[in-house]
C-alpha cells in the first residue's frame, strides 16, 4: 500500500454555530448527504456535528487533490460510522472518479473535536 493523498482541515465550531443562527440549515443542506442531514436534524449538538462533517469533507477533498469544486462536491463524500462508532468515509460520483484516477483503494479518516474546534484528517491509499 502507498499513500496517494493526505488532507487535514480544522473548523471553528462557533463560526458554524453563527452561520446556522444566521442562515438556518442552508449550510447543512449544502454540505450533508440525506443520511447525514437526518442525523444532523436529530442530533443533540447539530452545529458541532456539522462542523465535524464539514472538516471531514474538506480534508477528504484535499486528500483527493481537488478541494471542493473541480468535479468534487460535498455531496460526493459521505461520512458515516462503523458498528464500533469509528468514522468511515465513502466516495461517490466525482469524488469516486477522482479516487479511481489516483488508483486508490481505501480511505482512512480521523475526526476529533474540542471545545472550540473540529479537526479531521484523511489518508487515501492505493495498492
Swiss-Prot record:
Any Gene Ontology biological process: fatty acid biosynthetic process
InterPro entries registered for this protein in UniProt: 4-PPantetheinyl_Trfase_dom, 4-PPantetheinyl_Trfase_dom_sf, ACPS, Ppantetheine-prot_Trfase_dom
Cellular compartment(s): Cytoplasm
Reaction(s) this enzyme catalyzes, per UniProt: apo-[ACP] + CoA = holo-[ACP] + adenosine 3',5'-bisphosphate + H(+)
Source species, domain of life: Bacteria
Binding site for Mg(2+): 9, 58
Enzyme class name: transferase
One Pfam match: ACPS
Gene Ontology molecular-function annotations: holo-[acyl-carrier-protein] synthase activity; magnesium ion binding
Keywords for this protein: Cytoplasm, Fatty acid biosynthesis, Fatty acid metabolism, Lipid biosynthesis, Lipid metabolism, Magnesium, Metal-binding, Transferase
Keyword Ribonucleoprotein: no
Record-listed E.C. numbers: 2.7.8.7
GO cellular component: cytoplasm
Cofactor(s) this protein cannot do without: Mg(2+)
Function text: Transfers the 4'-phosphopantetheine moiety from coenzyme A to a Ser of acyl-carrier-protein.
HAMAP family reported in the protein's UniProt record: AcpS
Family (UniProt): Belongs to the P-Pant transferase superfamily. AcpS family.
Record protein name field: Holo-[acyl-carrier-protein] synthase
Protein species of origin: Shewanella baltica (strain OS155 / ATCC BAA-1091)
Organism lineage string: Bacteria, Pseudomonadati, Pseudomonadota, Gammaproteobacteria, Alteromonadales
